[in-house]
Each structure stands twice: as structure tokens, then as C-alpha cells.
UniProtKB/Swiss-Prot annotation:
It comes from Bos taurus (Bovine). This is Tetratricopeptide repeat protein 4. It is found in: Nucleus; Nucleus, Nucleoplasm; Cytoplasm. GO terms for cellular component: cytoplasm; nucleoplasm; nucleus. The gene is TTC4. Belongs to the TTC4 family. Interacts (via TPR repeats) with HSP90AB1. Interacts with HSPA8, CDC6, TBK1 and MSL1. CDD domains: CTWD_Cns1. The modification Phosphoserine is found at S51, S244. May act as a co-chaperone for HSP90AB1.
Length: 388
């Protein structure tokens, strides 16, 4: 019997297999209508991997994942795999997934300090590009504890301090890095920028302090000018004695002196030491008001009324609000009494009246037409005094 060679037998077997294979329809091919979706399920050709892998839906991908992240591998190998995965995400600018991968690598708690330092530094970079500068700074700080001379961590930390406007710290980190490599361009550029911003910030702080001191001095001078004129502020109407008023009131008044009222007016003093007040005029008949932003203390009421009512206001439909017809009052709220102010009086004369109290550093007066029915009704039942 003639013996057949092994190769001939193999070839004959393969030929018969191929003949049988060709005669049978192929059942594992793509469907024409959805071949792109099926193609995307092949791990090699996936454009984006799913965030959660279902073994039933993607068995091939689940198999690959189990191989890559085999828990039986050493912590160092697993951490290195997560580092590489994070790097791939980082290159794709998918910084959130990169952070997750680096975090998983750190969770392996491998014994390699250099690898852990790289994981911290890389995660810091991803956090930085996400705008999480504080988290990024925490990571590079952890990296430097493991590897003090890690230049990339130092550069990233300096950048974080710069973004957080910690300019002094940014300069310090740059100086520490330049001790390792005095020619590192990134550190040199960062230091120059941080130092410039630090000097600008320090200058602005000095200017702000000088401005605050100047304002405080001006406010103290204004407060002394008010007290020298025996003008009573509203807090003094609460029955406080002079000492408690000067203690408790000063802070309140100084705050008010530094603030503008809603219309932007503020108590001021001229070169001769004379005061100008923001003064509010109320017209209860029509629920209207006027604010004189700078009523000089030596000016008379009639002088302002002549200007304010030189033309008839739009709301004065009866055209009765003429300077000669107007009466000016201030109210003593404690006693529920009114005081009629002579138009020829100066503002200072009225403010020095023993029953006048200035509220919110803005003197307020009521104005109405003396001969009108509204004025008679408004004054009915009220005790009215005449200011002399």
C-alpha cells in the first residue's frame, strides 16, 4: 500500500473544507442596512468607547477590558495601564475621563513613588485644563511630596498659583524650580509674569490704603465740623447722652459719610471749610420730590425755591407752585409737630434748630402751597411752630 505524505493529506483536507465552506452561505456578515453600526461595535474600529461596558452587548470589548485590567496583575502594572489610558484621553482632550483614569491608577496604591508622582502630575494637568486650579494645585503638591524635584509638577503648580492670583506663591514656586533648572524657559516666563502681577497688586493695595486713609481723614474732619456746628444727627434723638452718641454714632456716621445716597449725592466741604448737604424736598400733595445734591449751608431756602420753581413743574397742573406761594416745614417726629421755616433762613440756621435732627445725612423738608385747601387739611390737628 502506497503511503501518502502528510502534506498531501493536509492539502486535501483543506481543499475539501474550502469546497464545503464555499457551498454554504456566510451567516456572520454585516447587514447592508446597518453595517456602520455593526462595524462600530468591533473594538478595533470603535471611535468612542462606551462609558459602561455591557458584556452581553459588547462581549469582545468586555473580554479586552478584563485582560487589560486583570486584578491579578501587580498594582504597578494596573496603575501603569490606567496612566496610559488617561494619557490617551488627555490627548483626545477628554479631560474628565483622563481625571477618572489617573484617579483609578492612584487607587491601586502601588509602591512606585515615581509612577504615583506622574499620576498626580498628569491628573493635575487634566484638572488644570478643566479650570479646577485648586484641585490641580493639590495634586502637584502631592506629587512634590513624592518627588520634590519633579519639574513638571513645579511648573504646573506655579501656573495654578498664577491663575488663583497667588502671585507671591507663584514666584516662590518658580524660584524653587529654577534652582533645579535655571534655564527652564516656562519657569522664567511664568516668574516674569507673576512678579509683574505681584508688583501691580502690591501697588494697588498701597494706593487703596492711601485712598482709604485720605477718605477716613476727610470723614473725621466732616464729623468734627458737624459737631462744631451743634447739628444733631438722627441717632442723637434716641435719648443717648453725648458720650455714648460720640462712641456709637461715630462708626455709623463715618460709614454714612463715605457713602452716597441713592441719587449719588454726598455731604461735602469746600476750601473755606463750609459744608454742602444733599437736601430732599417732599411735595405731599402730589407725592413728588426733588433732591438738591449740594445745598450750601449759607444758602437761603428762597434761593433754591426760585431756581426749582422758575418754571412750572409738569405735575403742577394748577400752576400754583410759585416761590412766593410756598411754605417750607420740617417735622419733629418724636413730638409729631411741624416747624414752619422762613424762606429767608439759611440751611445752617435751620439745621442748628434744637428740634431738627438730620436723618441719613440728608436733611428733609416738606413743601406745600400755604393758601391751598390741601395745606389746610394737611396741617389740621397738627401743632405747628414758627421758626424764628
Amino acid at each position: 500500500m502506497e503511503q501518502q505524505e502528510p502534506g498531501a493529506t493536509l492539502d486535501d483536507g483543506m481543499d475539501s473544507f474550502l469546497e464545503k465552506f464555499q457551498s454554504q452561505p456566510y451567516r456572520g456578515g454585516f447587514h447592508e442596512s446597518q453595517w456602520e453600526e455593526e462595524f462600530e461595535k468591533i473594538p478595533l474600529f470603535m471611535k468612542n468607547s462606551p462609558s459602561e461596558i455591557d458584556p452581553l452587548e459588547n462581549p469582545d470589548l468586555a473580554c479586552l477590558q478584563s485582560i487589560i485590567f486583570d486584578e491579578e496583575r501587580s498594582p504597578e502594572d494596573q496603575a501603569r495601564t490606567y496612566k496610559d489610558e488617561g494619557n490617551d484621553y488627555f490627548k483626545e482632550k477628554d479631560y474628565k475621563k483622563a481625571v477618572i483614569s489617573y484617579t483609578e491608577g492612584l487607587k491601586k496604591k502601588c509602591a512606585d513613588p515615581d509612577l504615583n508622582a506622574v499620576l498626580y502630575t498628569n491628573r493635575a494637568a487634566a484638572q488644570y485644563y478643566l479650570g479646577n486650579f485648586r484641585s490641580s494645585l493639590n495634586d502637584v503638591t502631592a506629587a512634590r511630596k513624592l518627588k520634590p524635584c519633579h519639574l513638571k509638577a513645579i511648573i504646573r503648580g506655579a501656573s495654578c498659583h498664577l491663575e488663583l492670583k497667588n502671585y507671591v506663591e507663584a514666584v516662590n514656586w518658580c524660584d524653587e524650580g529654577l534652582q533645579i533648572d535655571a534655564t527652564e524657559k516656562k519657569l522664567l516666563d511664568l516668574r516674569a509674569k507673576a512678579d509683574k502681577l505681584k508688583r501691580t497688586e502690591q501697588r494697588d493695595v498701597r494706593k487703596a490704603k492711601l485712598k482709604e486713609k485720605k477718605q477716613q481723614d476727610q470723614n473725621e474732619a466732616l464729623l468734627q465740623a458737624i459737631k462744631a456746628r451743634n447739628i444733631r444727627l438722627v441717632a442723637e434723638a434716641a435719648g443717648e447722652d453725648e458720650d455714648s452718641a460720640s462712641e456709637g454714632l461715630s462708626e455709623l456716621v463715618l460709614y454714612g459719610l463715605s457713602s452716597e445716597n441713592p441719587c449719588g449725592a454726598r455731604l461735602g466741604v469746600d476750601d473755606q471749610g463750609r459744608l454742602s448737604w444733599p437736601v430732599l424736598f417732599l411735595y405731599p400733595e402730589y407725592a413728588q420730590s426733588d433732591l438738591v445734591s449740594a445745598f450750601h449751608e449759607d444758602s437761603r431756602f428762597i434761593d433754591h425755591l426760585m431756581v426749582m420753581f422758575g418754571e412750572t413743574p409738569s405735575w403742577d397742573l394748577e400752576q400754583k407752585y410759585c416761590p412766593d406761594n410756598l411754605e417750607v416745614y420740617f417735622e419733629d417726629e418724636d413730638r409729631a409737630e411741624l416747624y414752619c421755616v422762613p424762606p429767608s433762613s439759611t440751611l445752617l440756621q435751620v439745621l442748628q434748630h434744637p428740634r431738627y435732627f438730620v436723618k441719613a445725612l440728608t436733611p428733609t423738608f416738606l413743601v406745600c402751597v400755604g393758601s391751598s385747601g390741601f395745606c389746610r387739611n394737611y396741617l389740621r390737628g397738627k401743632k405747628v411752630h414758627q421758626v424764628k
